[in-house]
Amino acid sequence: MSLTQRYTAHLGYAPPKFRPQFLESVGTTTPTDHIEYAAALGMAGIFDPWALGRDRRELDEIGRALTDTGLSCGSLVCVPLDKVTAPIWTDRTASGRHSLEQLIRAAAETGQALGSPALAVLVAADPDRTDIAQQRADVAANLREMGRVTADFGIGLAVEPMIALPNMLLRNITEAVAVVSAADVPGVGIIFDTGHVSTTDGDLLAALRATGEHLSLLQIVDMPGRVEPGAGELQLVDLLAAALDSGYAGLIDLEHYWADASRDGERAGLDRIRRFDALVDAAVRPQSATPSPQH
């Protein structure tokens, strides 16, 4: 059964195990096997946020598999895992800016090779500073400069607000919008993750409206538990339909665990995704004039 929207299946996003989304169904952790499986399911792409941690041989194999299957690549986290909670985005010293640019150029080269649309930016605060407003101004300045760097590679930057990691400086949509607006450079936007936003902002539709033109990437998970759409309590059909109606045409990352991580649970979860997709399709069709049920 084909899917109507541009979903991605992930190759592993949660440390320390980085379990691929369909591990039980595929039976291996080999990225190319998962890319072929995602294509067979009718997915539009794959999501490999920690691709920077892979070696060149594996990245080349992933690139060839994407070309062979016609799948797209989602966003990559812009720095290696060990630097995600370091205050690199608040550092405006000459050495700090030079180090940041080196990291971003390396990530952009990898993203360009895989066809990724954007680098995900997680912004940590500097624990040795108390000037939160100035730190956010420094982040905006660095985003402005690095956005111009990634533009040379045809790639954007996308800030992902959250509190799931320690010491985050940009924790919700309001804070992310303020910094991205201050950066004021094309190609720098916001990742809207329904799991994070439901925790930090509450009202998904209000947060989506607040994100507005800054929406770069959409990640769909249900809550509680970061499970597949339809396995939780969030009004995800309305959310995705609203994003599509507003003109969003990018990939939709399914960055979730399963309600049941067994092989049968993956199959049941995939059925939930297909039902969710059908409801979204009905909600965005012009002839559909009545609200759709959520689950």
Listing of model-derived features with the role each one plays in the protein:
Residues 1-112, 270, 274-295:
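N-terminal pre-domain/capping segments
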Residues 5-13, 46-48, 73-78, 119-121, ...:
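Hydrophobic faces of well-ordered beta-strands that scaffold small-molecule active sites
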Residues 10-16, 49-51, 78-82, 124-126, ...:
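Active-site beta-loop-alpha junctions enriched in small/polar residues
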Residues 19-28, 86, 90-97, 170, ...:
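Gly/Pro-rich active-site loop or hairpin
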Residues 24-30, 68, 89-189, 199, ...:
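Active-site acidic/histidine proton-transfer and metal-coordination neighborhood
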Residues 42, 184-189, 210-216:
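Glycine-enriched alpha-helix->loop->beta-strand junction motifs that scaffold or abut catalytic
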